[in-house]
């Protein structure tokens, strides 16, 4: 009995060490097919958005419900009523609250949002209302954080608000450019809040970033372009504006790329 107990104690310690050393991987995506592929690839969680061309906006409720029906992976939903800045009108904020309630009612695991004042500080009053509406779901403050005036003051504000994690590139366009700030943010945050690096993470830089920053979670976009099945292709018509994506290329999450990242964690 003693040896058996000793064996299980050692096994438990090794399991705890494994969980401590292995970071969680969140995949950023915008469609049901991608959620399915992310789960098959071994991701821990997904951030479900619409319109990643705009940096991610609120997905449709139908997209979320279908993704929830076909997968068991943790799904956090983006709450962002439009592209552009993060200072919202009263009716835009009202829409955000309604979206939080709707996703919560239909089984979302968490929400992702970000609201700033016109001076670049965290809008604490509106953020508090979003968080109250979302609980007990997980709450992530997205890269509006990187657009704030003072990263470290914003960090303290979000900790005071009780936010669970911050998605950030360290106040720079990509994680590799913001790596020094990310190191400082992780150290400053300690166990008070999760700092989740994201934007520009690839299979080739993930291991280096993880070893440097030592974050517990990472946010990754791993697309794969696929050729449309359409045979009839009127090449002179576009659904977008001046900056447009090809109409006959479909972008989904790459299951293979997810597996590659997961193996490195």
Where are these regions (language model features)?
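C-terminal alpha-helical cap/extension of soluble enzyme domains
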Residues: 192-265
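Alpha-helix-loop-beta-strand connector modules within alpha/beta enzyme cores
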Residues: 57-83, 124-141, 181-202, 248-265
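Glycine/small-residue-rich loop that forms an oxyanion/phosphate-binding "nest" at active or ligand-binding sites
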Residues: 74-127
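Catalytic cores of alpha/beta
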Residues: 33-35, 88-98, 149-160, 201-216
């Amino acid at each position: 009995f003693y040896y058996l107990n000793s064996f299980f104690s050692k096994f438990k310690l090794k399991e705890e060490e494994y969980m401590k050393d292995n970071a969680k991987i969140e995949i950023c995506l915008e469609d049901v097919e991608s959620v399915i592929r992310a789960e098959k690839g071994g991701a821990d969680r997904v951030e479900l958005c619409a319109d990643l061309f705009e940096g991610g906006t609120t997905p449709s409720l139908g997209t979320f419900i279908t993704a929830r029906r076909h997968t068991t992976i943790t799904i956090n939903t983006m709450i962002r009523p439009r592209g552009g800045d993060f200072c919202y009108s009263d009716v835009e904020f009202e829409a955000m609250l309604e979206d939080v309630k709707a996703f919560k009612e239909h089984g979302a695991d968490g929400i992702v949002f970000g609201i700033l004042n016109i001076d670049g500080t965290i809008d604490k009053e509106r953020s508090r209302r979003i968080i109250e509406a979302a609980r007990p779901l997980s709450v992530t403050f997205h890269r509006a954080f990187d657009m704030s005036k003072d990263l470290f003051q914003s960090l303290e504000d979000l900790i005071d608000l009780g936010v669970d994690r911050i998605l950030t590139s360290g106040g720079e366009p990509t994680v590799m450019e913001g790596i020094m700030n990310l190191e400082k943010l992780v150290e400053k945050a300690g166990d008070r809040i999760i700092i989740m690096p994201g934007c520009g993470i690839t299979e080739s830089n993930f291991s280096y970033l993880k070893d440097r920053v030592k974050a517990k979670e990472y946010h990754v976009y791993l697309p794969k372009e696929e050729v449309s099945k359409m045979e009839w292709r009127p090449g002179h018509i576009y659904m977008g504006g001046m900056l447009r994506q090809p109409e006959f290329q479909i972008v989904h999450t790459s299951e293979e790329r997810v597996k590659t990242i997961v193996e490195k964690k």
